[in-house]
Amino acid sequence: MILVKVIFMAIVSLLCRSQEIRNAFPSIEVYGSKFFYSDTGEQFFMKGIAYQPTPDSESLESKFTNIDEDEVKPTTKRYIDPLADPNICLRDIPYFQRLGVNTLRVYAIDPQLNHDICMNSLMDSGIYVILDLSEPAISINRDNPNWDITIWERYKAVIDSMNSYRNVLGFFAGNEVTNDKSNTDASAFVKAAVRDSKNYIEEKNYRRIPVGYSTNDDIETRSSLSKYFICGDVKADFYGINMYEWCGYSSFEISGYKERTQEFKNYPVPIFFSEFGCNLIRPRPFTEINALYGPQMANVWSGGIVYMYFEEENKYGVVELAKDKDTPRELEDFEILATSFNNVSPLAISKENYTEILKEKGEFNINCPSLSHLWKANERLPPTPNKEKCECIELTQPCVLLPLEDKTNYKKMFDFICGEVDCVDIKADGVLGYYGDFSECSVEQKLSVELSKYFLKQEEMDKCPYESKDILFQGAKKTSNQPKNKQGEDICSKYFKNLNINKEKKVDSNQKEDSNLTSQGIITISHTYCIFIMLFLVCLLTIF
């Protein structure tokens, strides 16, 4: 009995000690263009690896053996959250330690699941995590961009579920959303996501976790992209580049790293490789690591994240899972990467010394990129999605669309209804900087607005104007039935004052030719220039 008590007290003491260590675990702070440890002020460099198993590498059926069911619950999501399954993360942490990794990039987590075991175990191992706020089914679509309530609720849920872990290094508000000149307008929506995520963290009084963006390295857009996310009143806290220029046994000069380093030497926020590791040669020699963490680059870049941990069809992994899924097999890349990471020690600067350098530089003010045929993202950003406004659609409008099982029916419904009424109030255009009153609402809510407008246009109809079992007919609700606040004031009517049921000329959000850039004076004749031309013509007429 005495032995049992001694063991019990030892376990309690160990747990308490572990919790004390976690409470003292230093978070990573952004200061100027560097990352610093919050406790010592020592500069932090990422030695990271991308960590996201796919259904091909792990079973979607969570095993969760020997784990309390209240702690971890299986998920129906069509992606695997490695930070919510201790069988995955605890298996892999020893391999991370051998690699010399101090940062994981995880592209999608399930905010409904518990992450305590994995996040605390990573913390005990000195490993930080940088998280993407999106997930495959809920993200900003570069081809039809929107910053809507569905995506915003997802982002908030991830922030809510992960903010308490001190080893959360930061959040990505987007990843390669703009990837060439054809979709630069999508960046306006990502920048709005950066703005709202930062504001939300501040409003909730959470630890000041930085929010940034991860871009590709497209030659035509990289300069404008890098300026856009740090110009004006809304600025990303950090900027990651998915960089694959250095392949095999290249060099600082040949790879393009020299040019990129020169371009970003005065960048005002931390910049790093959010992915790197070209695989044209296998096994990868990772010779770029000596340059990235060496004197040629370490004064500009804050390290990087190797793509990736798991071997898949794309052949970027450093481990391959055996058939039982329980035993990672180290590939040749693993030992090379481990040797490379463990042998580099970048020259760091203290926060105190860096403060003096910042004082000399002064405040930065970057101009937003000029609009052109290569860059069309407007400086005017979409509004913060208003949950109350969007819910008012469901509470007050006569025709309410329920979620459709067949997703192709959404397009059919849009094509029909926008041919009957003016859909300008649900349009979102990052080129013109125009965002309709209900452009921030969900797809179902947007269609509900337009279906209801068509119903109201047809004065004698007693049903919704589109045959579907997924449309709930609520009729034209009386004012007395409208939702009210505690003071008895109507909540919703203010949102529908400008609703126009008549068919008018529509704003075409898909039209992205240069002629549409009149909102900021691109390829247009200014008022002053027109007056000059008129005076010139008058002079000619006088002479002749």
Positions of predicted regions on the chain:
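Cleavable C-terminal sorting propeptides in eukaryotic secreted/cell-surface proteins
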Residues: 519-544
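Secreted/extracellular ectodomain signature
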Residues: 379-514
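Short, acidic/polar
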Residues: 64-68, 77-96, 150-160, 220-232, ...
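Substrate-binding cleft of secreted/luminal carbohydrate-active enzymes
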Residues: 284-355, 446-451, 455
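N-terminal signal peptide
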Residues: 2, 9-27, 539-544
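Active-site groove signature of glycoside hydrolases
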Residues: 155-185, 212
